[in-house]
Each structure stands twice: as C-alpha cells, then as structure tokens.
Curated annotation (Swiss-Prot):
Pfam families: Humanin (PF15040). It comes from Rattus norvegicus. This is Humanin-like protein. InterPro entries: Humanin (IPR028139). The keyword Cytoplasm applies. Its main location: mitochondrion. GO terms for cellular component: cytoplasm; extracellular region; mitochondrion. Plays a role as a neuroprotective factor. Protects against neuronal cell death induced by amyloid-beta peptides. Also protects against excitotoxic cell death. Prevents amyloid-beta peptide-induced spatial learning and memory impairments, protects against amyloid-beta peptide-induced suppression of hippocampal long-term potentiation, and inhibits amyloid-beta peptide-induced activation of STAT3 and inhibition of CASP3. Prevents glutamate-induced dendritic atrophy in hippocampal neurons and also prevents glutamate-induced decrease in SYP puncta number and total puncta area. In the testis, expressed in Leydig cells at 10, 20 and 60 days of age (at protein level). Also expressed in pachytene spermatocytes at day 20 and in vessels, peritubular cells and spermatids at day 60. Not detected in Sertoli cells (at protein level). In the adult ovary, expressed in stromal cells, granulosa cells, theca cells and oocytes at diestrus and proestrus (at protein level). Expressed in the anterior pituitary where it is detected in lactotropes and somatotropes with lower levels in females than males (at protein level). The keyword Iron does not apply. One of its GO terms (biological process) is negative regulation of apoptotic process. It is found in: Mitochondrion; Secreted; Cytoplasm.
Amino acid sequence: MAKRGFNCLLLSISEIDLPVKRLESPNKTRRPYGASIY
C-alpha cells in the first residue's frame, strides 16, 4: 500500500528532476529516475 505512494513520490520527483538532468548531462542515458531502484 505504501508502495503506491512511493511510486507517486518518485514520479513527481522524476518529473522535476529529469528535465534538469537532461539539460545538465545530455550525453548520459535518459533513464527514468526510479529505474535504478527497481
């Protein structure tokens, strides 16, 4: 049950974080923020 909230949190974080990371390092692989965790 807590996993759903955790996924929502990750999603909101990645939505903010991904564009920033793309601007900082476009050379790196464009992976979702939570992909490294699972």
